[in-house]
Amino acid sequence: MSSLRFEWDPKKATLNLRKHGVSFEDAQAAFSDENGLLIDDPDHSEEEDRFVLLGLSHSLRLLVVVHCYRSEGKVIRIISARKADAQERSIYPR
């Protein structure tokens, strides 16, 4: 995971932690989950390509991390992160 770079809006990160109980720092770990499931998310932005990652945090919580890629794919911008719901847990490859 050391080659991955992350960025986010600090205000959004604070709001996300309050609302969902998931820090963006914790969400970074989902990107190192070898079983992570990457899903295209074309419906939520016309300006940029967005993606949803289902992946495990270091504390083994299954997270849903909405993100996009910046700087020609060299930077991952985290937009939101939350715990997966029952339907999302059912599609996660274990």
Q: Which residues does each PLM region occupy?
A:
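Ribonuclease/tRNase effector modules and their secretory precursors
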Residues: M1-R94
